[in-house]
Amino acid sequence: MPRANEIKKGMVLNYNGKLLIVKNIDIQSPSARGAATLYKMRFSDVRTGLKVEERFKGDDIVDTVTLTRRFVDFSYVDGNEYVFMDKEDYTPYTFTKEQIEEELQFIPEGGMPDMQVLTWDGQLLALELPQTADLEIIETAPGIKGASASSRTKPATMSTGLVIQVPEYLTTGEKIRIHIEECRYMGRAD
């Protein structure tokens, strides 16, 4: 089993009976001599989706779990269920709307590239999205001429219903790139 100082973002731990995906790691080096380096880790509980924070010393032993990751494409909606199809063997993976409610805000009609399903021991656990999503602005206040890139922001509604803050110079109909984890504007889409 690896030590806490060997854990990387994206790994999955079995901790206190929960499966936790590592989302972020902050390393805190103490100023006192002989004190251990602390690793403050932010997790997402695979089963419930709740955010969890834990602290470990660098030499603490942790139990890692190997999940199976499969690339999928969005296939169709059947009532309250969303079906994703494996890109290699065409296995369907079905999620309820409640299971992937947060992820649906970033998935445009027709799907997006690089989506993955996480399975463990044959059990479907989660849908993992890439770091960014390209979405179209469907509603925002009119663009202001002469507004610079560093000026104020305004709310904009995306094609999926997501509302984020964007620079004032953007207008309805433009495609923008959004950082999914931080839910923030990154720039215009290519």
From Swiss-Prot:
Tell me which family the UniProt entry assigns to this protein. Answer: Belongs to the elongation factor P family.
Q: What is the lineage of its organism?
A: Bacteria, Pseudomonadati, Pseudomonadota, Gammaproteobacteria, Enterobacterales
By its UniProt entry, which SUPFAM superfamilies does this protein fall under? Nucleic acid-binding proteins, Translation proteins SH3-like domain
Q: Which GO terms describe its cellular component?
A: cytosol
Query: What is the protein named?
Result: Elongation factor P-like protein
Q: Name one GO molecular function term.
A: translation elongation factor activity
Q: What GO biological process terms are annotated to this protein in UniProt?
A: peptide biosynthetic process
The record's Pfam families line, in alphabetical order, gives:
EFP, EFP_N, Elong-fact-P_C
Species in which this protein is naturally found: Klebsiella pneumoniae subsp. pneumoniae (strain ATCC 700721 / MGH 78578)
The family database entries (CDD domains) matched by this protein are listed as: S1_EF-P_repeat_1 (cd04470), S1_EF-P_repeat_2 (cd05794)
